[in-house]
Amino acid sequence: MKSAVSPSLVRPVHLVPSQRAALSPLFEQLRTELRGDVHADRASRGRYATDASIYQIMPLGVVVPRDQDDLRIALDIARDRKIPVLARGAGTSQCGQTVGEALVVDNSKWLNRIVEFDARARTVTVEPGIVLDHLNAWLKPHGLWFPVDVSTGAQCTIGGMAGNNSCGSRSIEYGNMVHNVLAIDAILADGSACRFGSLAQPVTDRRTLDLLHGVERIATRERDELVERVPKVLRRVAGYNLDLFDCQNPRAYTDDGHANLAHLLVGSEGTLAYSRQITLKLAPLPAHKTLGVVNFPTFYQAMDAAQHIVKLKPVAVELVDRTMIALSMENPAFRPVIERALVGQPQAILLVEFAGESRDAQLTQLDRLAELMADLGLPGSVVKMTDAGAQKALWDVRKAGLNIMMSMKGDGKPVSFIEDCAVPLEHLAEYTRRLTEVFHKHETEGTWYAHASVGTLHVRPILDMRRDGATRMREIAGEAAALVREYKGAYSGEHGDGLCRGEWVAWQYGPRLNAAFAEIKRLFDPDNRFNPDKIVNPPRMDAREHFRFAPGYAALPLQPALDWSAWNVTRNPLTGEETEPGSGTDITHGLASAVEMCNNNGHCRKFDAGTMCPSYRATRDEQHVTRGRANTLRLAVTGQLGADGLAGADVKAALDLCVSCKGCKRDCPTGVDMARFKIEARHARNRTHGTTLRERLVAYLPRYAPWASRMRGALAFANGMPVVAPVMKRWIGLAPQRALPTFARPFLAGAGAASMPAPDPQAGSITREVLLFVDTFSNYQEPDNARAARAVLEAAGYTVHFNVRQGERPLCCGRTFLAAGLVDEAKAEAKRTLDTLRPYLERGVTIVGLEPSCLLSMRDEFLAYGYGDDAARLAGHALLFEEFLVREQAAGRLSLPLRALDGTAEALVHGHCHQKAFDAFTPVQTVLRWIPGLKVSPVESSCCGMAGSFGYEAEHYDASQAMAELSLLPAVRARADGAIVVADGTSCRHQIRDGAQTQAVHVARVLQRALQG
């Protein structure tokens, strides 16, 4: 029985239209006739000028169609005006398939519906922009999935996967896209609509029949050449699948033996037709999975063992080499995961997965794997993982492989150009050994990972594409190609042709088949309108004018406000050694190099409830995702958006919805920290344009809060007046829907002069002393939080000091100044804090904070002020309230007499973005679980959307609410009766109060309630 799904799986919120500018007649027509987005400005085009490859070509413009009617209108206009068209999904191509001088049509924002689903037939029809992981999440309740599980599944689209003929980690079991696409509904270059599918049914449409006859004629004529020239390996994606009538792949394209004309479009990179709907073959979800991690003392042994391991019939065998292991260990999110998989210090590991209906059978397979490795001389080398969570965590590390490797600092980066050559398994060890020798010959090293099961290892030589990288790339490519030919492999095994490998199609297939491909292109697209210069008539791979780092690429001179010297280094590609911070050649002192860490792989285009990236989840706009912002910054700092650099309007617009959540700092494997870049951009803009009244009111809150506290009665009266408050909000630029913060008698006013005595260096043990750093908000607006924290700490037997001295203003983290880009003021606050706390830090006293964004700035931005050892010492002693309690409990120094909470059985916990970014969210849940009988339920949400003053600002209110409605507010409204809501961030609490009419509380307040006596 069929069930059709009309609503989109994800219906994005459209918030910020493209900036209007003087438009050509083409774009005036597009904007007039389309309901979707039309972008013609240079910054928008620049964000679509790159993908995850080394290339950059400015498109003519960008169209984001809202529906199928929009798509057809856009294609009609482009055809009438003789404009080339380039279909784009997630833009994660590593070979430049989605880069070109054309009208880019972005399917990912709106064209993402599930059109039809047949559970019994195990088929689904989707629009091209649907994300793979979204599709599989929707299919999961039906016990089905689409098994071409590529590593970019969280962001890649089905349309892009079909255009690329993607493969995935489990292709040894399920095949490639060509094995799993049943039909494609497409629009041809002449505007006609055709359905390409199985030839088991007669073709009746005249246009489709003409194409079929033409393809059959060419394929029949070239049959002998296809048999002779097409590599006999599973992974082979170069050129067109002209062997669809006489399959040369080791795995048959179809189950019934009938040819399928859709398979000619699969892997065609959008050069033949525009796919509007794709019908897929589904597979049952395996009931159980187990994972064996095999540790190898040498890389060669790992490669040699692959041919033996596949005989055990695993569904996946994936490689992680020593470089990727080392880089994973540097990432705090990945380190504990990878450590659990290691035995000693291996040079390589293989992830071997078994899946099926019988768990016992899989456990037997794991035992057989261990026996096999013992027979191969490696007893005890297998780490068995049967827990689903542990398996997923390790697969997530593997899936992040490219991004992890791209986290290398310095100008040299692993470059994609021979990363998916495929060779028969029996030659894999020798191929990798000899290719490594080629790298060494050219004074570089390669990083290896991925698909050992099918002889397709991703390897990227480390090259500096600013300098001699292009020359060495050409030389290495030639020698690698010779090895591939010797071993009868495929030069393009998985990632397609694009700009990088298009010129090698003729080398792989010879002049006859290359000419046949050109004939196919003319048959479908005689005017060369669909993605020109791909597969047929491609440019040279080393055409430097197409590089992201093109000739003349250079940053504008810039003196940053923060310290970026860690990125201004030189790296030896052979040894991996880095020079000292600040020793590189970056004239921006590391800032440009930090921006260039973004490799465009699109990990930030995730849609789940993790940390990154809330503004993208709300808007689905490339402008408002970390990748889009990084590209905007890169274009700006290199003068490609004009002479204004970071102070320009394009940068301001790109960062407009960035809530500085630091999700990218944690989740981006290359460590792109957009919150820190936003500080720099605001600082640069302030120097040119100054600050607004609203910005100054927010920034200087710590300075005038004492006055506001004394005037709290008058302010509360004014805030409650029905005329005064709205006028005040409108004058300042605040959202009328928001309630203004109220002030209270400051907590520290009662702490007294003795709150911060000069400590005695000769004093005894300091294990029972803490300094409670009461932030501006906890002091002047929510003093009950500070009182609760003091009560809990004193109940646990600690002597509590505070961050204030008699007659002085309390110490401040400077966070509000940072948010406004007033870095000099923030540094001044930090310097005062460091100088005052130095005696405590020298004695090892822990600094405990309540507000995550405040306390955690001491572990983050303070280190970028240039204050050296003082800042590092503070970072090592600064803990959030709950982190401190967990540490003390683990050390056996904490005893809290907690009792059950009357009338409260559950705590719904929302994590502040910075808590998540610094792995500080788990301690909140831990301490709450100390309360007897309390069920602790974390909310699966990203940023609450308030983000300090962001949600108060009139122009950002809608975006703020959209972010909150993604996960947080629905979860709060749906909580069980009597459940309390816990949120440590003051902004989070205000958002929950405004959006769900619920008063959330700080964890300290909950613990105070639970104290006995």
Residue positions per predicted region:
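N-terminal flexible segment immediately upstream of the FAD-binding catalytic core
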Residues: 1-80, 90-122, 151, 174, ...
